[in-house]
A protein has these predicted regions:
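Thiamine diphosphate
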Residues: 49-118
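Conserved thiamine diphosphate
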Residues: 129-164
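Glycine/aspartate-rich loop-and-adjacent alpha/beta segment that forms the canonical ThDP
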Residues: 22, 54-56, 169-218
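Active-site diphosphate/adenylate-binding microenvironment
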Residues: 17-65
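N-terminal low-complexity segments that are often proline-rich with Ser/Thr-Pro
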Residues: 1-16
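Generic beta-sheet signal
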Residues: 38-42, 83-87, 112, 171-177
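Glycine-rich beta-alpha junction loops
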Residues: 44-47, 119-121, 178-183
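Long, charge-dense
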Residues: 117-128
Length: 218
């Protein structure tokens, strides 16, 4: 086989592997069907904007920063053990505070379900590659930190199966979802961060019959 033909064949194989490995982020979100009493904690940027469109609900709390999502979600799961807490995180955010994985491994919460959408890029700042585009394996790091059953899925069929099982069974889950870098604009946020947080607080206060903020919040 000539070098040119070999080169074309390798390119075709690479394309097939890439298509099989990755799928659209927005498409993936539609497969996460959470219960009416569940708490959703969602990373910032496109993750929040897409989720607000796919699943608008008072029980969503949206982040305004990076790196602190796992600690906050773990805290929510600990103080609300009777409710399922679903964290939608990203590779860039998890990489910013890897030490959170050791805490997660040491103090697991059976009602916490974590999905890390890994597009191997910092999309919000221009698509610069994260270290997961090279050799870093977030699920492997989580396993080494004591997070049992942490795994990576790379196609829609595997994701649908993993998401369905995670949301239907007891026990903490940690699923890294390989998705393609999104193209085009994301849906515009319907609420400001302050409005969304206020709505979430009112929702928890009403459903838990507890006061969280003693001052008036709007």
């Amino acid at each position: 086989m000539g070098l040119i033909k070999l080169g074309k064949l390798l390119i075709q194989v690479a394309i097939v592997v890439a298509v099989a490995r990755e799928f659209a982020f927005a498409q993936a979100l539609q497969e996460i069907r959470i219960g009416s009493s569940a708490i959703g904690f969602i990373s910032l940027g496109r993750t929040a904007e897409e989720w607000a469109t796919v699943c608008p609900r008072d029980g969503n709390m949206f982040s305004s920063g990076m790196g602190n999502h796992i600690p906050i979600a773990l805290g929510l799961a600990k103080v609300l053990p009777h409710r399922q807490v679903i964290l939608l995180d990203t590779d860039g955010s998890v990489l910013m505070l890897l030490s959170a994985l050791t805490t997660l491994g040491a103090y697991p919460a059976p009602n916490l379900k974590i999905f890390v959408f890994d597009n191997e890029a910092y999309e919000g700042t221009g698509g610069q590659p994260t270290d997961t585009s090279r050799t870093t394996d977030i699920a492997a790091i989580a396993v080494a930190a004591g997070v049992r059953g942490a795994a990576t899925v790379q196609d829609m069929a595997s994701f649908k199966s993993a998401a369905g099982e995670a949301l239907a069974t007891d026990g903490m889950t940690f699923t890294v979802v390989k998705v393609e870098l999104a193209k085009g604009p994301s849906p515009r946020a319907r609420l400001s961060h302050r409005e969304g947080l206020s709505r979430f607080v009112r929702y928890v206060e009403a459903t838990e019959k507890k006061t969280i903020l003693h001052t008036e919040h709007t």
